C-alpha cells in the first residue's frame, strides 16, 4: 500500500462501496479542491489503483472532521489502512477529531470503533437520504490547540 497526497483526480477512478455511492455526484468541486490544497487528505494506492481517499478538515479550536471514501473492494486492504489511520490519529495536531457514520451501514461504525473513536450518539435525519447517523469522536485531552 502506498499513501499519496490526495488529488481530486483520484476520485475519478474510485468505485465507491454501495453505502457511499450516493456521495459520488454530490461532492462539491470547490470543496474537493480545498481538501487537495490543505494537505490534510490522502489517497491509498494498492496495485496501482486508488482504493480509498480520506483526511481531516480543520474545524478550528483544535477540532478536525474526519472523512473517508472507500472502494467497493477495499476490504483486503482495510487492516493496513486501519494501521495507517491509527498512526495519523495518534500524531495529529487536533485534540478532538469528529466523524459521522450512517446507522444503516454497520461496517463504518465498526471501523470507527477499531480506529479508537467513541460513539457520542445518534444524529436523526443527518444523512443525505434522510437516514440517521452516529456521531463519533477521537479525543486526545492533553493535546494543545492547533
Label each PLM-derived region with a short phrase.
Residues 22-41:
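Active-site rim helix/loop that mediates acceptor-substrate recognition in acyltransferases
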Residues 54-62, 123:
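A conserved beta-strand-loop-helix scaffold within acyl/acetyltransferase catalytic domains
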Residues 75-90, 110, 114:
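Conserved acetyl-CoA-binding loop-helix of GNAT-fold acetyltransferases
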Residues 92-103:
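Conserved GNAT acetyl-CoA-binding A-motif
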Residues 100, 118-133:
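Conserved catalytic-core motifs of GNAT/GCN5-like acyltransferases
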Residues 39-57:
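Conserved beta-hairpin
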Residues 61-73:
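Conserved acetyl-CoA binding element of GNAT-fold acetyltransferases
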Residues 1-28:
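Short amphipathic alpha-helix that is part of the acyltransferase structural core
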